[in-house]
Amino acid sequence: MKPLASLRDIKTRINATKKTSQITKAMEMVSTSKLNRAAKREIVRSYMEKIQEVVANVASRGRSHPMLVSRPVKKTGYLVITSDRGLAGAYNSNVVRLVYPKRSKNAMLPPDEYAIIVIGRVGLSFFRKRNMPVILDITRLPDQPSFADIKEIARKTVGLFADGTFDELYMYYNHYVSAIQQEVTERKLLPLTDFLAENKQRTVYEFEPSQEEILDVLLPQYAESLIYGALLDAKASEHAARMTAMKNATDNANDVIRTLTLSYNRARQAAITQEITEIVAGRNALQ
């Protein structure tokens, strides 16, 4: 009875692994479809580049603004973009490990010197379990978010710098490089101290109303668009990471199925050989 029991066990494992393979394959195909639809990134990038050009033109004429000037740092804000779901390989863990405040000096920052703004349920759960100061969060965003979906948290985030709550603000997210490569990125969002260095004046504009009023309107919009652009970048990275993770899971499941099938065939052959041997032995005993 033992070989038969072993055959049943192997067959059960094969069927279970096949079902798992079907699920991971379906998830891979869904993620591939979502990645192919994540085309808003290019539109937003063009929009940000145009705002950059206009603002750099104004600022290069000697106009200053609080969002363009560094100040003594008493409190730092960290905007962290994660996903609402797992099964995406190291997508989330790479980001939260970068933010977890064992900074370069390997010392924990006092809670009153930093605060965290989280996009995504995975990051929110991670930081709350460690009693880290999360002051803003948003979850359950759609797979193809519009600016309206994050307008409120983007406005509040920029406002926390404008009102002096934060003296500097950093973003952490996964930057989409390709379907098989995503890079964990740390980007200084505010103040925009590198803004002028990265943008040389290209076009001469005539401004109406005053240049100061233009900066008051455009700089917050630009900072908010940077947050939205990072979110779209992170969403594309999430879909790519999940697609890759599910493909690897499907490939591994297929390898297991092949190994189990080989074991099943060998066990079945051994069982048949044993039965034939017993029949022949019984016949010889009767003679």
UniProtKB/Swiss-Prot annotation:
Tell me which family the UniProt entry assigns to this protein: Belongs to the ATPase gamma chain family.
Species in which this protein is naturally found: Geobacillus stearothermophilus
Q: Name one GO cellular component term.
A: proton-transporting ATP synthase complex
The record ties this protein, via InterPro entries, to:
ATP_synth_F1_ATPase_gsu (IPR035968), ATP_synth_F1_gsu (IPR000131)
Q: Which Gene Ontology BP annotations are present?
A: proton motive force-driven plasma membrane ATP synthesis
Function statement: Produces ATP from ADP in the presence of a proton gradient across the membrane. The gamma chain is believed to be important in regulating ATPase activity and the flow of protons through the CF(0) complex.
Q: Which Pfam families match?
A: ATP-synt
- Give the membrane topology: Peripheral membrane protein
The protein's location, in the record's own words, is: Cell membrane
Which controlled-vocabulary keywords does the entry list?
Answer: ATP synthesis, Cell membrane, CF(1), Hydrogen ion transport, Ion transport, Membrane, Transport
The molecular function GO annotations come to: ATP binding; proton-transporting ATP synthase activity, rotational mechanism
Assembly and interactions?
Answer: F-type ATPases have 2 components, CF(1) - the catalytic core - and CF(0) - the membrane proton channel. CF(1) has five subunits: alpha(3), beta(3), gamma(1), delta(1), epsilon(1). CF(0) has three main subunits: a, b and c.
Give the principal location in a single coarse category. membrane
State the protein's name.
ATP synthase gamma chain
